[in-house]
């Protein structure tokens, strides 16, 4: 059996392929020389790479290539664009444009629903709006979608980061909605809803891990050193963490409202019609799973926010303590300065170029020095004593609790007796049992007359 290709000619074919550039990216196929295909000279021809019969192959990119290069779009007042999936999970169209009013009329939507599916950069409150026996309008984070019983519309976005997440969602939807996944227990609309919720929870998890790593590292750094730059960074990151907490909290509330309403649960069945009396255990388990996961992110974010607030309070206490220490140091310096000023006041008087009758005294200099030092010491000691009483942080004046309680008991027994004695000497009237003086009618008339004269 002769070889199909002469190996000596392979290098020549490779050189020809390299030297002759191809103008168009066209697919090729191999043609066998078996069956007597010969050249006019009677020799067997070398298999060639010939063009396929169809010239349209490779002319347009596939839907998968478009999803890989999914890009944000420019908003339009007349059209909305979306990627469409059919009942088998296949991509029917990528970034297909629809007229807004025609789209609303076709899917029995109201003009107020246009804001939830419109391609815009405005973030609105997450919602899952159910149109009974018609469709499910979903708006959560970066996903705006419309789910029917045999079709899914995922609307495009203008945010580049959201466009990347939507590209991941497209592949998840395609694999989840495909009938090749095996026996499908869930309905079509529930599979689409679960794929969207999985993407939402994955986005929340990735965002929370980012916030936790950044804020946690800042908190660890602040435990070792209170830095102004770290505090500023913590303030900025705490704002972003608060926004994440609010987003996850709103998503949890949306899922909670769905679980609490049997009417909405019944309306989520589009393939089959169900009422409030039917069993929704499969759908409830689906929603409860992602509700629990979202609640976990809410609790963790709330705990991290509380840690940040506690750290801020501790930092404020430390800063207040440092500020008080600086003020105390300033007061001490002022007290020492005052003592030094008092000490130099008397020598200043003594050094005046005037007669003070002690210039010729042998004890004058020593007396002035001793008097100056003593006066400075007394003034400084008195000021430090006053400062100590001000800075003493106790609830009671006495630092000894037993002594304070004894003083309170003594005061409670001696106070009425002292009040009686004070009343005898002060009022010159016999006091009553409470220590108050007893006034007669004549005394009251004198006091009343005195008050009236004073008003005039």
From Swiss-Prot:
Its main location: mitochondrion. Gene3D superfamilies: 2.40.128.330, Magnesium transport protein CorA, transmembrane region. InterPro entries: MRS2-like. Disulfide bonds: none annotated. It is a multi-pass membrane protein. One of its GO terms (biological process) is mitochondrial magnesium ion transmembrane transport. It is found in: Mitochondrion inner membrane. Pfam families: MRS2-like. GO terms for molecular function: cardiolipin binding; magnesium ion transmembrane transporter activity. A motif (YGMN) lies at residues 350-353. Residues 1-38 form a transit peptide. The chain crosses the membrane at residues 326-346, 360-380. It comes from the Eukaryota. GO terms for cellular component: mitochondrial inner membrane. Keywords: Ion transport, Magnesium, Membrane, Mitochondrion, Mitochondrion inner membrane, Transit peptide, Transmembrane, Transmembrane helix, Transport. High-conductance magnesium-selective channel that mediates the influx of magnesium into the mitochondrial matrix. Essential for the splicing of mRNA group II introns in mitochondria by affecting mitochondrial magnesium concentrations, which are critical for group II intron splicing. It also suppresses a variety of mitochondrial intron mutations and its absence may disturb the assembly of mitochondrial membrane complexes. Belongs to the CorA metal ion transporter (MIT) (TC 1.A.35) family. Homopentamer. Forms homooligomers. Interacts with MFM1. PANTHER family: MAGNESIUM TRANSPORTER MRS2, MITOCHONDRIAL (PTHR13890:SF27), RNA SPLICING PROTEIN MRS2, MITOCHONDRIAL (PTHR13890). This is Mitochondrial inner membrane magnesium transporter MRS2. It comes from Candida glabrata (strain ATCC 2001 / BCRC 20586 / JCM 3761 / NBRC 0622 / NRRL Y-65 / CBS 138). The lineage of its organism: Eukaryota, Fungi, Dikarya, Ascomycota, Saccharomycotina.
């Amino acid at each position: 059996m002769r070889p199909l290709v002469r190996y000596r000619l392979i290098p020549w074919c490779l050189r020809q392929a390299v030297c002759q550039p191809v103008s168009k990216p066209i697919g090729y196929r191999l043609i066998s020389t078996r069956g007597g295909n010969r050249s006019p000279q009677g020799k067997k021809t070398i298999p060639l790479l010939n063009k396929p019969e169809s010239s349209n192959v490779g002319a347009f990119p596939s839907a998968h290539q478009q999803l890989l290069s999914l890009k944000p779009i420019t908003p339009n007042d007349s059209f909305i664009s979306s990627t469409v999936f059919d009942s088998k999970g296949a991509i029917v169209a990528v970034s297909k444009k629809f007229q807004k009013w025609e789209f609303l009329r076709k899917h029995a939507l109201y003009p107020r629903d246009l804001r939830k599916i419109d391609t815009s950069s405005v973030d609105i409150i997450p919602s899952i709006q159910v149109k009974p026996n018609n469709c499910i309008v979903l708006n959560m984070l970066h996903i705006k979608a419309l789910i029917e019983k045999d079709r899914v519309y995922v609307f495009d976005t203008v945010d580049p980061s959201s466009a990347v997440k939507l590209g991941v969602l497209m592949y998840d939807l395609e694999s989840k909605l495909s009938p090749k996944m095996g026996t499908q227990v869930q309905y079509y609309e529930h599979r689409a809803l679960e794929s969207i919720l999985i993407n939402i929870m994955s986005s929340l998890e990735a965002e929370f891990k980012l916030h936790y790593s950044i804020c946690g590292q800042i908190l660890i750094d602040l435990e070792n050193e209170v830095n102004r730059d770290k505090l500023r960074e913590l303030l900025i990151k705490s704002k972003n963490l608060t926004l994440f907490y609010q987003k996850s909290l709103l998503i949890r509330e949306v899922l909670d409202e769905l679980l609490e309403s049997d009417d909405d649960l019944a309306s989520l069945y589009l393939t089959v019609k169900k009422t409030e009396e039917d069993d929704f255990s499969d759908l409830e388990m689906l929603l409860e799973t992602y509700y629990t996961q979202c609640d976990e992110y809410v609790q963790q974010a709330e705990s991290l926010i509380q840690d940040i607030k506690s750290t801020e309070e501790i930092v404020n206490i430390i800063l207040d303590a440092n500020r008080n220490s600086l003020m105390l140091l300033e007061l001490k310096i002022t007290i020492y300065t005052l003592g030094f000023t008092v000490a130099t006041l008397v020598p200043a008087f003594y050094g005046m170029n005037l007669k003070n009758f002690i210039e010729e005294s042998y004890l004058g200099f020593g007396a002035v020095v001793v008097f100056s030092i003593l006066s400075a010491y007394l003034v400084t000691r008195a000021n430090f004593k006053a400062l100590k009483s001000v800075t003493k942080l106790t609830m009671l004046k006495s630092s000894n609790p037993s002594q304070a309680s004894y003083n309170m008991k003594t005061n409670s027994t001696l106070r009425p007796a002292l009040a009686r004695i004070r009343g005898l000497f002060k009022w010159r009237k016999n006091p009553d049992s409470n220590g108050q003086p007893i006034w007669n009618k004549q005394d009251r008339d004198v006091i009343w007359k005195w008050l009236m004269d004073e008003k005039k």
